[in-house]
From Swiss-Prot:
Catalyzes the reversible cyclization of carbamoyl aspartate to dihydroorotate. Zn(2+) 2 binds at residues 98, 135, 173. GO terms for cellular component: cytoplasm. Its cofactor is Zn(2+). It catalyses: (S)-dihydroorotate + H2O = N-carbamoyl-L-aspartate + H(+). Substrate binds at residues 15-17, 41, 135, 218, 251, 263. The modification N6-carboxylysine is found at residue 98. The active site is at residue 247. GO terms for molecular function: dihydroorotase activity; zinc ion binding. Binds 2 Zn(2+) ions per subunit. Pathway: Pyrimidine metabolism; UMP biosynthesis via de novo pathway; (S)-dihydroorotate from bicarbonate: step 3/3. The gene is pyrC. This is Dihydroorotase. It comes from Neisseria gonorrhoeae (strain ATCC 700825 / FA 1090).
Length: 344
């Protein structure tokens, strides 16, 4: 039977929620990943060092006994952010600030209204070596939802990189050929995370044969040509600029199967297996370890994990749902097969 042993991966873009939801989902990530970059879009958002440290303590309390998993904490960038906050964050071990354009995604109401007013804050991030994580979509109602990432590149990303050229930027959960091209052409201070859904699915998987609410995420799934461009990027000559970030974003089944359903796909329970499928289909299994376990650590300036995990070429059936607080949670590929299984 085919096996693949790799350095334990890291999830460089993860939503763990809070309270009972946190307790339900944290063990799935802790089982596979050594570390994860934790998104700060709680209600209310994680905007201060005190918020982040308190949230980290709640995450640690939700982990299985004996877990070595390490959450890497971030702050939610707001219009009120200051260079002093950046210095405080650095001193406290916060790894990054996250940009949510106001209204772009779940719990983004506190997001930034004009990033260019925060240039002194971004300059301090560059000085302190704190990363800038970007949800790269414009929220202008005149821009079609399928075009919001591409529009963001010209309107925001390129001008910001020109004004703060040494800022370390992660273009999060990229979904388009345009975003991949920007990262490929930019300096080594610009990288990107890519989700399993944007490597495996296209917008037909959302809309053909009925609306599939469990395939609804933001940024929304794009055309097949964009999916192919992402696969080419993560397996190509400059693959070191791309790394694993699931954007696993749990919502209760009742909130997804809804007249106004929430955006987000829960992939944490089988994340590395789904990525293995992508790389296997692309004939690039030898590049999975760098994507999952090396590139992100290098970009964040942290050592690779010291231990390994082993994947077996053995099919598994994903549960139709798992418990989630008072309700249930539908994972990515629910009820379906994945051709790889982690040996636990």
């Amino acid at each position: 039977m085919q096996t693949l042993t790799i350095i334990r991966p890291d999830d460089m873009h993860l939503h763990l929620r809070d309270g009972d939801a946190l307790k339900a989902v944290a063990p799935y990530t802790a089982r596979q990943m050594g570390r994860a970059v934790i998104m700060p879009n709680l209600k209310p958002p994680v905007v201060s060092v005190a918020d982040a440290l308190a949230y980290k303590a709640r995450i640690m309390a939700a982990l299985p006994e004996g877990s070595a998993f390490e959450p890497l904490m971030t702050l939610y960038l707001t219009d009120q952010a200051t260079p002093e906050l950046v210095r405080e964050a650095k001193a406290a071990g916060i790894v990054a600030f996250k940009l949510y354009p106001a209204g772009a995604t779940t719990n983004s109401d506190s997001g930034v209204t004009d990033l260019f007013k925060l240039i002194p804050v971004l300059e301090e991030m560059a000085k302190q070596g704190i990363l800038f994580l970007v949800h790269g979509e414009v929220t202008d109602p005149e821009i079609d939802i399928f075009d919001r990432e591409a529009a963001f590149i010209g309107r925001v990303m390129k001008p910001v990189l020109a004004q703060v050229p040494n800022l370390k930027v992660v273009f999060e959960h990229i979904t388009t050929a345009e975003a991949a091209r920007l990262v490929l052409e930019a300096g080594d201070n610009v990288a990107a995370t890519v989700t399993p859904q944007h490597l495996l699915l296209n917008r037909n998987d959302l809309l053909v044969g009925g609306v599939r609410p469990h395939h609804f995420c933001l940024p929304v799934l794009k055309r097949e040509t964009h999916r192919q461009a992402l696969v080419a990027a993560v397996t190509g000559e400059k693959a070191h600029k791309f790394f694993l970030g699931t954007d696993s974003a749990p919502h209760a089944k009742s909130a997804k199967e809804n007249a106004c359903g929430c955006a987000g796909m829960f992939s944490a329970m089988t994340a590395i297996e789904l990525y293995a499928e992508v790389f296997e289909k692309a004939g690039a299994l030898d590049k999975l370890e760098a994507f999952a376990s090396k590139n992100g650590a290098r970009f964040y300036g942290i050592p690779e994990n010291a231990d390994t995990i082993t994947l077996v070429k053995q099919s598994q059936t994903v549960p139709a749902s798992v418990p989630y607080g008072d309700g249930e949670l539908v994972p990515m590929r629910a009820g379906g097969e994945i051709g790889w299984t982690v040996q636990y």
